[in-house]
């Protein structure tokens, strides 16, 4: 599956700014794993108050980097 197909099939249904729960569902991992990735900088994010938000563009960058490694 190429990068464009990932975007069209997986991430197209999600909003441009995603919650931890939405990010978790998109990646197929637990929210605990997403929190770890956000805290250690694996996925770029922004904090709104006490909540993390993940711009879809940052999630796409993460996926692109990891697809290149695979």
Task: Cite the ranges covered by each PLM segment.
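Basic Lys/Arg-rich amphipathic helical interaction modules
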Residues: 1-36, 56-70
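Short Lys/Arg-enriched helix C-cap and helix-to-coil transition segments
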Residues: 46-52
